[in-house]
Amino acid sequence: MNRQQNPSPENRTSRVMTAWPDALKLFFFGFWMFFGIYYGDVLYIAQQYSFFSTAQGAMRPLWETSYGSLWIIGRALLQAFHSPFWGGALLSGMLTLISWLSGYVFRLRGRFGYLKYIPAFVFIYVVVYHGFDIYYQTETGKLLGIPFCILLILACQAVFVRSFSRKKLSGLFTPPAYNRPLDEWKAMGFILILGAGAVGMNEWQRPYVRPTARMQDWKGMKATASRSDLTYGTVAAYYAISRMEDENDVPKVPIDMLPPTSRPIYLHNRDGNLENARNYFLTDYCIASEQYPIAYELGKADLNTNGPSPLLLKQMVRICLALHKKEEARSHLNVLRTLPFEKDFIETYAPEAQE
C-alpha cells in the first residue's frame, strides 16, 4: 500500500512563494487605498482648488503659458478626485504603469526588479512632503500633469525598445518568467517599507494636512478636531469655524483677535516665500464669523491674484448672497455651471440667487 508522502518544508515554501501575486498588484491596490482613503480628503481639496472649465475660451489663458497644454491635461485628470475613490484608482493606475514601463525600458528585472518602483515613490514622497503646497497658490495641473508626461515618455520609449529588441513586454500583472519568487518577495518588501515611510512622513512631518483638509470639506469637523493636534493653527481655526457654524452662542472673534499659530505650518505663496498659515483659512473664518465685507475683499483679491477655483467660486456665492449682491452671485453660479461635478451646490444656492 502506497503512502502519500508529505511535501518537505522547502517544497511547501516554494509553492507558497510561487503562488504569491505579482508585486505590481500589491502596489496598485495598496496605493489605491493610500490615495483614495488615507490621502483622499487632501486630494479632494486639491481638486476644489483646481479650475477646469468646459466653456469655450475659459482655459485659453493657461493654454498660452509655458507647458499650458500639459497643465490643462493635469487639471482635467485631477477632476477625478471629486470622488477620491475613483481618483485614487486613476493615480495609482498611472504610477503602476510608470513602474511597469520603467522596469521594461531600463531592464530592471530579476534581483533588481524592485528598483522600477523608485520613480513612483519619488512622486509619492514629494506629494506628502509638500502638503498644502501641492495646491495652495500653485499650478494644480502639475499634480497629475507631471506623472502623465512621464507615463507618455516611457510609453514612447517602450515602443522604441520593442521595435529594435527581441525582448517582449511581460503582462502588466504577470511576473516575468525570469523573475524568481524571491525577487517578487523582495519587491513587495520594498513597497511595504517605502509605503509605510510615506505614511510615517505625513504623520510626523505634516500631521495637520489631513485633518485640515477633512474639516475644510465640512465633514465631521468637531470629531476630526478632537482627534487632532489643536496646537496647529489650521486645525484650531477650522475647529473654531465648526463651533461658530453650529452654535449661535459662540462669540464671533474678529480677525485681529485670532491667537497666533503656536506651531509652524509648511505653507508657501506663489512666489515661493513662507506664507502665514492664517491666510490659508482666513476667508472661511470670515464667512463663519459673519465678517462678510472682509471676506468679500479677500475673495476678490484672491480671484484677481490666483484666478477662479471651484472652492473660491462657492465661497464668493455664499458671501455675495449674505451681502445681497445677487447679480454677482448669479455670475459666479454661471461660471460654476461650466465646471464638472458642481450640480448639487448650484441646485442649493441658485433659487436664493434668483429671489
Each language-model region and where it sits:
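Membrane-interface micro-motifs in multi-pass membrane enzymes
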Residues: 45, 49, 63-67, 115-164
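Membrane-interface coil-to-helix junctions
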Residues: 33-77, 81-86
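Membrane-interfacial, low-structure loops and terminal tails that flank and connect transmembrane helices
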Residues: 2-18, 164-182
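Internal/C-terminal transmembrane anchor helices
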Residues: 179-203
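Transmembrane-helix motifs of polytopic, lipid-linked glycan transferases
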Residues: 92-110, 125-126, 154-159
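Aromatic-anchored segments of alpha-helical transmembrane domains
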Residues: 32-36, 119-131, 170, 177, ...
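Soluble catalytic regions of membrane-associated enzymes that act on cell-envelope
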Residues: 201-355
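N-terminal membrane topogenic signal
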Residues: 12-28, 110-112
